[in-house]
């Protein structure tokens, strides 16, 4: 919501799309044109939103794709529809942080290069990748634990996974974490190492700090390579400059 807040200050009219009512909470106090709630996960849905905006007003000056770097299906879909409709699109790519104290892995099977037998490993991943990572870590003889966020999809997926039911925690953070809950889980389960994603966001930074301070290993699942032929930026300042350069063309 930082981008939306800053763009409003610059005088832009903003429509925001979020996947759930919960995700809309940070935006509700902002003076937005509209908050669209529900996953825009198909070409038809994205096309419909863009065309509706054109029918009811002047349409969107630009679509800004702020989706998660591991949500690999949505960016190509947005890009395809925007190209078809001649809709300007800018993709925000989170900066990649320095990972000097972490091990970078391209895929979960790369964990096989490390001695994990009888080690307690905490999976701090998106729930969609939980079962795959669980299979590899368990297969290497690790004692596997996980933490997931308190939303219906995550709870359903972890309950249907093969993880031992006493080995996961459901977290319901009300704001950015200060790392104390994460440290408490590490102490409770006597964790030797954490697996998380190279997301480039607050969560990755948090795990880097927590693992460093507690002297445990951290494995980062490498971020998917960015999509070619999509106009992308990696900071708010560059976004503003790009929008201004488009508007004077």
Give the predicted meaning of each segment.
Residues 16-39, 107, 155-161:
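N-terminal beta-loop-helix "entrance" segment that forms/cooperates
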Residues 18-24, 92-96, 127-129, 148-154, ...:
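Short, polar loop motifs at secondary-structure junctions
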Residues 1-22:
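N-terminal basic/disordered segments at the start of proteins
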Residues 141-176:
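Histidine/lysine/aspartate-rich catalytic loop segments that bind and position anionic ligands
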Residues 31-53, 171-181:
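Glycine-rich, highly charged phosphate/nucleotide-binding loops
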Residues 109-145:
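Internal active-site segments that recognize and position negatively charged phosphoryl groups
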Residues 50, 62-110:
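Glycine/small-residue-rich loop that forms an oxyanion/phosphate-binding "nest" at active or ligand-binding sites
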Residues 61-62, 120, 192-193:
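Structural motif
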